[in-house]
Regions:
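A conserved beta-strand-loop-helix scaffold within acyl/acetyltransferase catalytic domains
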Residues: 1-148, 163
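Short C-terminal domain-edge/linker segments immediately following a structured domain
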Residues: 13-16, 44-47, 91-92, 157-161, ...
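Residue-level detector of alpha-helical recognition elements and their boundaries
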Residues: 38, 42, 59, 153, ...
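Solvent-exposed, non-transmembrane amphipathic alpha-helical segments
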Residues: 43, 47, 64, 68, ...
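Acyl-donor binding region in acyl/amide transferases
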Residues: 119, 124-126, 130-198
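Active-site/acyl-donor-binding loops of N-acyltransferases
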Residues: 170-233
């Protein structure tokens, strides 16, 4: 919750949307950064359209307004600097005040490249959730560097969780990763820990099994994937 509260510093706006294109752009960013293969735009669009027929899907977007945020940050920074110059900060609060100044200066550095480019706001994180009549699942999420900096990822998960609670769903499944939650493989242990902090219970399901309908391709595909990943590196 500490990270969710951090997102309040950036006046994020959370809206539900039908914008698959922006979501796809964001998840491609994650795929390139974290070395996984995202599906095509057509796949996500088809998925969304089919689930939307039954009102079993929602997209939660986190939007930031760089111009407003820069102006707000400049004002807060100036006020703190003036208080220090005028000796208005008690000694016991001086360290925290200087840390706040560093944070504000960093925010200006991060957001300045986006100034005067997004008057209607910039979507920095997009989360797709699916639903049945009694349960909710988070499925796909994409974000850019601003989404990471502003804790928009945590905020989107939190807002989807609140939405599930407000709509009286019996449970909200954050999904997980394959295998041991303490694994050292890639960032899977960190992903488990990230989701655990939302207060849920870790449940190990039976697992997934392949239904093989093309045996030849089934044998060849792992080798092709290995070659693909080697070339990509």
């Amino acid at each position: 919750m500490k990270t969710v509260r951090k997102s309040n510093n950036y006046d994020l706006e959370i809206k539900q949307s039908d914008d698959i294109k922006t979501f796809h752009d964001l998840i491609l960013n994650n795929a390139n950064k974290n070395d996984f293969k995202a599906y095509s735009l057509n796949y996500y669009q088809s998925f969304y359209d089919n689930f939307k027929k039954y009102n079993h899907v929602k997209i939660f977007n986190a939007i930031v307004y760089p111009d407003k945020l820069i102006k707000k940050t400049q004002t807060e920074l100036k006020e703190l600097q003036q208080k220090i110059e005028n000796n208005q900060i008690p000694e016991k609060r001086m360290a925290n005040t200087k840390n706040s100044i560093k944070r504000l200066e960093k925010d200006l550095e991060v957001f300045s490249p986006y100034q005067n480019k997004y008057p209607d706001g910039k979507i920095i994180c997009s989360l797709i959730c699916s639903y049945t009549n009694h349960a909710a699942w988070t499925l796909y999420i994409g974000n850019d560097s601003l989404g990471t900096h502003t804790a928009a990822v945590n905020r989107c998960y939190y807002e989807a969780l609140k939405d599930a609670y407000d709509n009286n769903y019996e449970f909200y499944d954050l999904f997980g990763t394959i295998g041991d939650p303490k694994t050292t493989y890639k960032n899977l242990a960190g992903l488990h820990e990230f989701k655990r902090k939302f207060g849920g219970e870790y449940i190990e399901f039976l697992g997934e099994f392949d239904l093989i309908n093309k045996p030849v391709w089934y044998k060849i595909l792992p080798h092709l994937l290995k070659i693909y990943r080697t070339l990509k590196k």
